[in-house]
Design a protein with these regions (language model features):
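Residues that cap or delimit alpha-helices
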Residues: 20, 76-78
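Amphipathic, soluble alpha/beta structural segments
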Residues: 112-116, 136-139, 204-213
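Serine/threonine-rich low-complexity intrinsically disordered regions
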Residues: 2, 8, 20-23, 27, ...
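Intrinsically disordered, low-complexity, charged/polar segments
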Residues: 87-92, 97, 148-218
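Basic/aromatic-rich interaction segments and small domains that mediate binding to polyanionic partners
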Residues: 34, 49-76, 125-182
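Mixed-charge, Lys/Arg-rich low-complexity intrinsically disordered regions
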Residues: 28-30, 78-119
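N-terminal intrinsically disordered, low-complexity, charge/repeat-rich segments that act as generic
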Residues: 1-69
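Short boundary/loop segments of OB/S1/cold-shock single-stranded nucleic-acid-binding domains
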Residues: 119-125
Length: 218
């Protein structure tokens, strides 16, 4: 994890209300684990969205994580330390982990979608074309001009952009695995950090995934 990302996350966490210094320390440690294991972060948040009672991560070496999803609260436990957050604050916390710490895949990357999470009509569309659930990414963190951004825009692989099909708006949660990463260099890394992370935090932009969850909670 790059130092500038952790500094940005610390600034984001300071925006959250009613967090003690100890709470922030625990939540930072949890965030480092989640960002280092995107599959765990993904499974953890999907369980939350599905109103499951909890999610448990028990690694061989690292600290175990336990999430308990209650009606109005979320309890997060790491070893013997526990933080309790209102559901709305947990959503805000998750959005900052995603914004500041999650990997932003390069343009041109080919990813596989998780068909179990896709809308039925999209699954049928892929199947009718006899396509694998592969997508090539052509846009990242696209500002929707409503205070939110969509994680990725892409097109079905291997066809790419076609005039007879609309682009796909994709959430990080839909990504099952990365098949092939696109080209990246220091210019791309600088853009991701300074614009897609820092400028978005300054502008108050969050992923539409968490905006939708906020709407559902009201």
């Amino acid at each position: 994890m790059k130092e500038e990302q952790m500094i940005l996350f610390a600034r984001a966490l300071s925006i959250c209300n009613n967090l003690s210094e100890k709470d922030q320390e625990v939540l930072t440690a949890v965030a480092m684990t989640l960002s280092g294991h995107p599959d765990v972060f993904r499974a953890c948040y999907i369980a939350f969205m599905n109103d499951e009672p909890g999610y448990h991560y028990q690694p061989m070496i690292e600290a175990p994580l336990e999430f308990f999803y209650e009606k109005e609260l979320v309890r997060i436990r790491r070893f013997q330390e526990e933080v309790t957050l209102p559901r709305s604050l947990f959503i805000q916390y998750a959005s900052y982990v995603d914004l500041c710490l999650s990997r932003i895949y390069p343009l041109g990357s080919v990813i596989e979608l998780d068909r179990e999470l896709l809308p039925k009509d999209l699954v049928e569309s892929f199947e009718s074309e006899q396509m694998d659930f592969f997508v090539v990414l052509s846009g990242r963190r696209v500002d929707l001009a409503n205070g939110h951004y969509v994680d990725y825009i892409g097109h079905g692989y291997p066809f790419g952009l076609r005039f007879d099909t609309s682009p796909l708006f994709l959430s990080n949660l839909f990504i099952k695995r990365v098949v092939s990463e696109g080209y990246s260099d220091t210019v791309d890394e600088h853009y991701c950090q300074e614009v897609l992370r820092k400028d978005y935090l300054d502008a108050g932009l969050i992923s539409s995934v968490y905006a939708e969850e906020e709407v559902n909670e009201d």
